[in-house]
Amino acid sequence: MYSERLADRLRRALQAVEGVTEKTLFGGLAFLVYGNLCCGVIGDAILVRTGPDFYDAALQEPYARPMDFTGRVLRNFVYVDLDAVPTDEVFHEIVTRTVSYASSFPRKTPVTGRRVAG
């Protein structure tokens, strides 16, 4: 189960990004860039793939916490409480960073999942 409100917000933020698809994952909704996990919604939180260069800095933010879906912390992923994100600009910066990181991987083919409308 996941928040449709958060999913819609991510869809709007990602609609202009080329190669974005969505599919169910971890009981939530995942957004992929050319087949590489970018971000998603699990419950009432946004899952963000930070990568190693931004992970520690992301955890210093009051709106972020470690991803511990299985009871163990998964490095390079954080949960973001969208209600605690102070501004739309910060939200878009978070989305831009996660798209940039996911885009740094080789494209997976074929890309499966439902295309994010744009």
Feature-to-residue mapping (PLM):
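Charge-dense, helix-prone N-terminal extensions
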Residues: 1-118
